[in-house]
């Protein structure tokens, strides 16, 4: 059975930070944020397994949990799928929860916080900022557009 490789950066600081936040989180929002972040990463992991047929290496740090892409070369299209998988999971879960609450289940405190936190995690990760999924998505789209323009530039449109 394949093994999951997890690298923890600054384990003492990470443990202290999480322990402190969990101790003062009387509303449960931090626990819900951790759940939504883990679900986000599960989206990336599922697509990585589908593309590469192996488990990815993971890194945990104060910035969060992320896939380690060291030594993994993907085409821009495959990297686009991988980068979009995490936010897609969050947005899908938020939409599903809102649709479920709009039906027979009715609105609940947990449901609203779960949907809101998923929207926040998914939306935040779509920002085109270095280190986030949005940056990788924008880079992949740029590469795909440049490739498409390069391929069609040999044929004049006149």
Predicted regions and their residues:
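Hydrophobic transmembrane alpha-helices and their immediate loop junctions
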Residues: 1-158
